[in-house]
């Protein structure tokens, strides 16, 4: 099945559904890394330096603000991968931001909610990009007026409506991991480590899963080691193939940038599983 991409009045490209999916997934993977790397590099440094000057507390809050915009960054990168023009790209980003749930509506205004739900961002991107593709340039001069509503606000609103159901996935995983903590310690650590290893490079937020389960002690250590196991599988797999920047990013724990490769080559799950079992 092919999807036709329009720019102006000219057809510029035909994409398969598969390439459409991976273009969005690549945008998500890179966007997550861009949003999180400043915090990974400087977050703990600023916390330490905040003892000596309040300016570092302020700078640390800027890192948090930057990560809250992850869905916007993801939307822009996905739009670029899909060869959208500038207005289409920012409309896609706006839809992703609304659908992410990064902002909650409260009686007192808006409340920041971290990066939001990445699974829901993915669903919202598919809906918004599909609408933008379908409309193309069919609306002519009305595009600039109607496309933000049809391709941005409405898909974002749909994303908000399905957000509670997306969170059920995280909740179910959290409940499963909570059940693992009731098992024999050896079996528990193996199951938790392998689960975290296999899920690290998916749109599922392990931070959200950890919040649901409130892991501590041996279980928390197994989860952390599972994450380390996944990072090192990708790190050593990248040696000699990727550039220094990619290898450095993997070394500091940004394995989510390999999300598209993980889905494109599911065989990667085998070394991840083995490493997770051994380290568990």
Predicted features by range, described:
Residues 6-280:
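Pore-lining transmembrane helices
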């Amino acid at each position: 099945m092919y999807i036709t991409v329009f720019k102006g009045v000219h057809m510029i490209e035909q994409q398969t559904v598969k390439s459409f999916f991976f273009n969005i997934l690549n945008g998500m993977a890179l966007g997550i890394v861009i949003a999180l790397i400043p915090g990974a590099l400087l977050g703990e440094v600023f916390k330490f330096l905040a003892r000596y000057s309040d300016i570092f507390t302020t700078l640390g809050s800027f890192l948090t603000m930057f990560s809250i915009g992850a869905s916007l960054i993801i939307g822009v990168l996905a739009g670029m991968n899909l060869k959208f023009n500038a207005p289409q790209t920012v409309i896609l980003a706006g839809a992703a931001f609304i659908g992410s749930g990064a902002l909650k509506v409260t009686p007192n205004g808006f409340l920041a909610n971290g990066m939001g739900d990445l699974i829901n961002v993915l669903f919202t991107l598919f809906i918004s990009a599909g609408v933008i593709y379908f409309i193309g340039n069919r609306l002519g001069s009305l595009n600039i007026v109607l496309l933000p509503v049809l391709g941005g606000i409405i898909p974002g609103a749909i994303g908000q409506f399905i957000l509670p159901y997306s969170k059920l996935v995280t909740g179910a995983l959290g409940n499963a991991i909570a059940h693992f903590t009731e098992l024999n310690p050896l079996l528990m650590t193996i199951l938790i480590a392998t689960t975290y290893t296999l899920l690290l490079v998916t749109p599922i937020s392990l931070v959200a899963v950890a919040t649901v389960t409130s892991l501590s002690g041996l279980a928390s250590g197994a989860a952390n080691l599972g994450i380390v196991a996944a990072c090192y599988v990708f790190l050593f797999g990248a040696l000699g193939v990727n550039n220094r920047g990619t290898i450095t990013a993997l070394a500091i724990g940004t394995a989510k940038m390999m999300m598209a490769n993980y889905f494109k080559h599911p065989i990667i799950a085998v070394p991840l599983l083995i490493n997770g079992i051994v380290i568990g």
